[in-house]
């Protein structure tokens, strides 16, 4: 889709930023080749690095009505890190993650944003968990547990804007 291509393009641009290089220097090697990365990374690190690169310049997509968030970065980062060469499954997982963010965003916004939370961060962990659940073909019980873990990790205030906290 166009949003996947857009996210890949902004991630490649972000990969040239010195802040992306600084993060990359802290990450161990592994088998996953993240777009724009000169070396392989562990899946979790590939998702982290790609997510940072894709959101670093703040040109990624922005859904402004329900989720009030950048949908593509967390969903695509999780799906790409687990995709291998299965493009069809990657697309399904990406859409699954975006739908999760949209459903939660419709329930929680505009109050979430109005209370000072950054919806991309708060909702993004759910989108990433949903996308990863699809990529890994988790059972319903396993997917529920992945979403519970996402709830435990959901955070991100708009007070982080202006620093590395926003793209991270």
Kindly give the residue locations of the regions a language model identified.
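N-terminal core-entry segment
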Residues: 1-168
